[in-house]
Amino acid sequence: MNRFWPPRPSHTVLSVSLPAASPLLGSFAANSLRRVAQIAEIIRGYQDLAPDERNDRAKEIVQLRHAEAAAMEACADVLDCDASATCLRLRAEALRGGSWPERVERCIGLDETRLISLSGDLHTWHNKSREVFHSALFAAVDRRYDRLVEDLDGQIDALTCYIQTTLNPRLIVRPPALFKVGNLIFCGGEANRYPKHFAYFLPEDEGIKRARMKKTVVFANVYSAIYHGISAPFGSSALVLEGDDDQTAAPSVKDYLICWFRGHDIGHGVVLPETDFRVLGQQGRAASMMLQEVMADLFGLLLVSGGPWSGLANLRSDVAVKVFLNEMLRYLRRGETYFPDAEAAFLELSFLELNGFVHVDFDRRKIMTSVERVLSGVTQMLTLLAGTALANDVEGTKAVIDRYGSGARAQFSSKFRASFGQSTEVLDYVQTV
């Protein structure tokens, strides 16, 4: 299988240096984890062999998995965080043949304060392959963002009131998945191929569906590198945001990314009492996924551009909107036929453009709007989707897709692609002990 996705004539590789692991974890732990990532690369390479060749390597692959497990257990012995050490040991047991679902699910509820660990089977991009492939990832927990997310989550009741007042008094917020933020230090296997993931949804991305507990893991350094290396440069050339002042000091963009993504996570659980996503599934799996991503994206922006989070995290609506638009355009330029997130980004831009909240000048390659127009459009879009997709209105939801989706607006999609091109940038990690 090609290391790169989606298919492109060429890719632009951006080199990103991951933090040195020894100052964070100590030399012994760092070298142990580097060994795991290196072994994961070998195992993943064997998975690309023809079936007969792979079978010939079966015994060696088992030995390699055991070597990974031994290195993870050695690291666990020197960590000063019981939860981080327990996760390593549970995943080591799974690599040796222990019950995979049982051990992985036990890891989900752990509150690591030093190290986030993933190893073993992991999904890749949905349209790249439906199979799971071998990976190993390790990230140092970012305690500042851990505390920030804890503070944000403490505002759920206030968020619910804000959403009800802004959109619909019948909307409720389901308890969100657990959330852990770290800075990636080692990566091997399928996860080290292209494009890189800045987040994983566990244990679903490990092939375990309908788990009792779920956790979102975000790599803040990777997310920031994607934004500053891909999203922001394109946005600065194409986006004209009325009143934007690059000279005005603003909090770290990384704060906005983490807060928006937590808002996105929470947005997946904003529903009406009667919402049944099986009804939404009648639109087809791809359309259902796309609409759920649209709503999560928009709820995320709503939460970081106003309401209780703004004061708590010192967030400004103008910066929040700019970051959101830059990310929306990055997702869209990946190609809506390859990623549900890109299809969602297309519908978002399509709605904003068709209803006059955004103007796209294809000749000048400019996308023009204002903070106020975007927020007004987002509120209108969420109100529409709450009354259709969340209200189990099959015909109303179909009408939204038929009016704003890429199938209905093929000419707009084609003109956008011809004018603004598609993203070819991917990250490559420089990993050091």
Q: For the regions a protein language model found, what residue spans apply to each?
A:
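N-terminal helix-rich structural modules
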Residues: 1-104
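Contiguous, non-catalytic segments that form substrate-binding/exosite surfaces or channel walls
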Residues: 66-246, 253
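An active-site-proximal "capping" alpha-helix that borders the catalytic cofactor pocket
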Residues: 81, 289-306
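Extended, compositionally biased alpha-helical segments that mediate assembly or anchoring
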Residues: 144, 391-433
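Active-site recognition of the HExxH zinc-binding catalytic motif
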Residues: 256-273, 296, 301
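Long, well-structured alpha-helical subdomains associated
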Residues: 301-403
